[in-house]
């Protein structure tokens, strides 16, 4: 039963702290209007309210809606021909690495024999 009371108090304290940390919207608007110097920033004012961002080039703005863009990109990555080509390239690289390791091991063994003879 104590756990329920502790949990309720923790929730109440969290809600109280989070709600008191945010200023009211009236105070927020007045702070934005009074604290931003107009000579430093190039801002647009409409009806006495400062706009944060202005986009002049609307033609270049592209939005991806739905799954079209993500789905097309995913399907491009799932090309089986490219996957087979990549697997073949990886296998060739592994074979080359194994060949080089074998050559290095043979050279190392030869050097050990040469050092051991002296």
UniProtKB/Swiss-Prot annotation:
Signal sequence range: 1-21
Keywords of the record: Host cytoplasm, Host nucleus, Secreted, Signal, Virulence
Chain ranges for the short sequence motif RxLR-dEER as given in the UniProt record: 50-64
Cross-referenced InterPro entries: RXLR
Protein's cellular compartments: Secreted; Host nucleus; Host cytoplasm
GO cellular component: extracellular region; host cell cytoplasm; host cell nucleus
Pfam families the record matches: RXLR
Induction: Expression is induced during host plant infection.
Protein family per UniProt: Belongs to the RxLR effector family.
Domain notes: The RxLR-dEER motif acts to carry the protein into the host cell cytoplasm through binding to cell surface phosphatidylinositol-3-phosphate.
Function (record text): Effector that enhances P.infestans colonization of Nicotiana benthamiana leaves.
Protein's UniProt name: RxLR effector protein PITG_19617
Lineage: Eukaryota, Sar, Stramenopiles, Oomycota, Peronosporales
